[in-house]
Amino acid sequence: GQKLPSENTLSAQYQVSRQTVRKALAILQNEGYMNAEHGRGTFCSEMMRHAHPSKNIAVVTTYLSDYIFPRVIQGIDDVLTGAGYSIVLKNTKNSRTREAECLQEILSKDIDGVIIEPSKSQIFCRHMNLYEQLEISHIPYVLIQGCFPQMKDKPHVLLDDFQGGYMITKYLADHGHKNIVGVFKADDMQGQNRHKGYVRALQEAEILYDPDKVVWFHTEDRKIHPYEAIREMAGKTLRGRMDAVVCYNDQTAQLVIRALQEEGLRIPEDVSVTGYD
């Protein structure tokens, strides 16, 4: 950080004794606002960077231009702009490494707060130190869409994904479907909770849960695996025994529909397909 003037200079500038200057610097150093380096002088710490409001809010999402994200970002921007704040956009592509890089960059800039969608939120976070540094620097943050397992006590805004997965599966069961396949994302909290809702609805409908009727995919294979797995089921392993598919989201549902149609099945006459979001 910026180097402070000498004790003599500060004493003359503020017309106080050197002893008073030393006491003031000691208090600031103790609070973490200053760092004294032997032989070099006293410097402002990173905390000083955030001591004055910048009216900048960082918004970190997994994606920017795909799927629902443009609408989410637009909604955030409308509220922030109305309150006199500017938005600083970052995206992680659901990568832990990129998330850590975004947080490091935020810590080096004048940012008043952070709205962040955690990457692969079902997996233990290994860069907790960066979130702790936000707190040390008095930068408030809120998690959206997901929450790391060890951060349940931090501010977060989540959908009720369990209830959503439950309701959509119950709807299919109530309409007579008995062979309901599920397609869920394994590395995000949303996918795990939607799957739990799916399981609960099957139990209540007295439909046996079959792990062979559940497709799990990850961020890296999200555009390939659901399509390939459903096509394999429709063409071989479950041919004639699949009457509905509960999908993690609408993007996944589009892949599932294409796979089923390429196997000669009609939607919804032969197989009902549900989306989410």
What are the residue ranges of the model-derived segments?
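Short, flexible, glycine-rich and Lys/Arg-enriched loop motifs at helix boundaries
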Residues: 48-54, 117-131, 218
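Bacterial carbohydrate/catabolite-sensing allosteric modules
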Residues: 31, 78-86, 105-112, 125-277
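Amphipathic helical "hinge" segments at domain boundaries
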Residues: 49-113, 120, 199
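The beta1-alpha1 cofactor-binding region of Rossmann-like NAD(H)/NADP(H)-dependent oxidoreductases
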Residues: 7-8, 96, 162
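N-terminal helix-turn-helix DNA-binding module of bacterial transcription factors
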Residues: 1-51
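Phosphate- and divalent-cation-binding pockets in alpha/beta enzyme and binding domains
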Residues: 43, 68-71, 197, 255-256
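Short, ordered loop/turn segments at secondary-structure junctions
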Residues: 39, 92, 119, 146-147, ...
